[in-house]
Amino acid sequence: MGICKCKKRSEDFCFNHKKFICDSCVVADHSICYIKSYVSWLTDCEFEDSVCGVCKGKFDVDDNDDSVRLLCYHLYHPECIDVYVAALPQNSSVESYPCPKCPEPILPSNDKQSLLANSIRDRFSVSSWAGDYLKSFKKQNSNSNNNNNDNNNPKSNGITNGINGTHINNATSPEFYTNLDSIKSNGIHHHHHHSNNSNNNNIINPSLLEETPPLSHLNSNPYGLASRKHEHEDTVIQLNSGTNSNISNNIHGNNKIYDDDYDKYNKRPVNPISKIINNIKETKPKYLIMITVAIIVFLILISKMGSNSDSNDNIVGDNNNNNNNININNDNNGGNGAINEETLNDQKIPNNGQ
């Protein structure tokens, strides 16, 4: 499910332009494009140029009348559809004629209202097989529109009195105030009115005069709308002053939602710095774990290196001590040998002299 450029949700996807489209935009901007569901595009995005489903011929890009797209989005030449329909059984109804490729009907149903459905009706309105059916549809549609207009715009030329059923002119018409003048000049009072309605069917009920403003205040405005207008203006001013901030907040909020929806499927420029920052934010726990593990390994290596250096120092010290002991022993042994030889020589010399 995606969003078309006109903000409508749609599952249809244009393979040529690689974007979501609705049944309204397909008529204006994608008249001969290859269109299928978005799931089909995800499955296989390869497509060929659109050709007629009956004659397999290509369409003229510059001629919009050269092709017609049905509600199932299959494309045909209008002449090929006419030939295809002529070969169908005559006992079948016009609205049930199926598409040459699928069981969907060629003509849209009466309750289907869209730009695509209207374009199909306009295209086949000149065909002999669909002309009568489409004319009856247009006639029925025009009658329903007239009935809706009559219901929405009732004729109200006056107000009916709920007491005696007499018809009263609109209070804003000049005739209303003319009748008021005549009633006051005839001496009719508000509180002494009797129900003598047979002779006064066309005269306003005098009890209504209590709600009408005096004529002396209508010199500047004969319709008596000035005071009411000012009251409404004061009300509007108070409403605007009290709700100005709320309205502005709602407008900004709606614009924000609109911008988010509009930019949802648009490509944004890639900023390397912001991309790196976003990646760091997304992978922050991973980086913390990696940094912690690296610090622990570093401390372990340092401790092992320190212990190895201490053991090496001890070994070197022992070797030096052994060497010193050996040298001392050698020195001692060498001195004793020299003394013994001298003593021996001293002893031998006298013996030789004898």
From Swiss-Prot:
> Mind naming one GO cellular-component term on file for this protein?
Golgi apparatus
Q: How does it sit in the membrane?
A: Single-pass membrane protein
Q: Which Gene3D superfamilies match?
A: Zinc/RING finger domain, C3HC4 (zinc finger)
Q: Mention one GO molecular function.
A: zinc ion binding
UniProt xrefs under InterPro entries:
ZFPL1, Znf_RING, Znf_RING/FYVE/PHD
Q: Identify the keywords attached in UniProt to this record, alphabetized.
A: Membrane, Metal-binding, Transmembrane, Transmembrane helix, Zinc, Zinc-finger
- Give the compositionally biased regions (Low complexity): 196-205
Segments forming B box-type zinc fingers: 1-41
* Main localization of the protein described in the UniProt heading: membrane
Q: Where in the cell is it found?
A: Membrane
Q: Where are the zinc fingers (RING-type)?
A: 52-103
Instruction: Give the region (Disordered) as residue ranges.
Output: 139-167, 187-225, 326-354
TM annotation in the entry? 287-307
Entry similarity comment: Belongs to the ZFPL1 family.
Protein name, as recorded: Zinc finger protein-like 1 homolog
Q: Which gene encodes it?
A: zfpl1
